[in-house]
C-alpha cells in the first residue's frame, strides 16, 4: 500500500512537471535518466550473478530495433518509449515488489516514469513531423515480443530470485542498447 501511495504521488508530481515543460530535449534528459536508471538497477541486485549462471537465458533482444541508422527519429523515439513502458510494466507487478528492496524499486520506477513523460512529449512532437506507421508498428511489436519472452521466463521459473537476477541483467543490457541508440540520434541532430 505504501508503494502504491508513494508511486501515485511521484506520478502526480512528475505529470505536473512534464505538463509545464514544453519541447523535446530527448538526447539530454533521456540519456541522463537512462544512466540513473542503470545505476539504480545495478544497486537492486540482491544475489551474486555467478550463483545464477545455470539460469541464464537468451531473450533475443531485438538489436536491429536499437540501430539508429535504420530508421527515422520518430521511429527511434517510439522504440525507446515502448522499451521503457514495458520495463516500467515489468517492474510494477506484485511479483516484482516481492523481489526487490522497496525504496530502490520506487526510485527506479519513478525514474522510468519520468523518462516515459519525456518520451511521450517527444513522440507527439516527432510523429507529427515524420510518418512511419508501418515500420513503427513492426518495431514496437518486436519490443513487445521481447518483453513477452522475459515475462514467460519469469513465469516458467516461478519468479525465483535467480530468474529475477537474470532479468535484471537483461534489462540493464536493453537500457545500455537504449543509451547507444540515443547517442546515435544525438549525432544525427
From Swiss-Prot:
InterPro entries: 4_helix_cytokine-like_core, Interferon_alpha/beta/delta
Keywords: Antiviral defense, Cytokine, Disulfide bond, Secreted, Signal
Species whose genome carries this gene: Homo sapiens
Compartments where found: Secreted
One of the GO BP terms on file: T cell activation involved in immune response
Stated name of the protein: Interferon alpha-10
Pfam family, one: Interferon
A single MF term (Gene Ontology): type I interferon receptor binding
Secretion signal span: 1-23
Protein purpose: Produced by macrophages, IFN-alpha have antiviral activities. Interferon stimulates the production of two enzymes: a protein kinase and an oligoadenylate synthetase.
Amino acid at each position: 500500500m505504501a508503494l502504491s501511495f508513494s508511486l501515485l504521488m511521484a506520478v502526480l508530481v512528475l505529470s505536473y512537471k512534464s505538463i509545464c515543460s514544453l519541447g523535446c530535449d530527448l538526447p539530454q534528459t533521456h540519456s541522463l535518466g537512462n544512466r540513473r536508471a542503470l545505476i539504480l538497477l545495478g544497486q537492486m541486485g540482491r544475489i551474486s550473478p555467478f550463483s545464477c549462471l545455470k539460469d541464464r537465458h537468451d531473450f533475443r533482444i531485438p538489436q536491429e530495433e536499437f540501430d539508429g541508422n535504420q530508421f527515422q527519429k520518430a521511429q527511434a523515439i517510439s522504440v525507446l518509449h515502448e522499451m521503457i513502458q514495458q520495463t516500467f510494466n515489468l517492474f510494477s507487478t506484485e511479483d516484482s515488489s516481492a523481489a526487490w528492496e522497496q525504496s530502490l524499486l520506487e526510485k527506479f520506477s519513478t525514474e522510468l516514469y519520468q523518462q516515459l513523460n519525456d518520451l511521450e512529449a517527444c513522440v507527439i512532437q516527432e510523429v507529427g513531423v515524420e510518418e512511419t506507421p508501418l515500420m513503427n508498428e513492426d518495431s514496437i511489436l518486436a519490443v513487445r515480443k521481447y518483453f513477452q519472452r522475459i515475462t514467460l521466463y519469469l513465469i516458467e521459473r516461478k519468479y525465483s530470485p535467480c530468474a529475477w537476477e537474470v532479468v535484471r541483467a537483461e534489462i540493464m543490457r536493453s537500457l545500455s542498447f537504449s543509451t547507444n541508440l540515443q547517442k546515435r540520434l544525438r549525432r544525427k541532430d
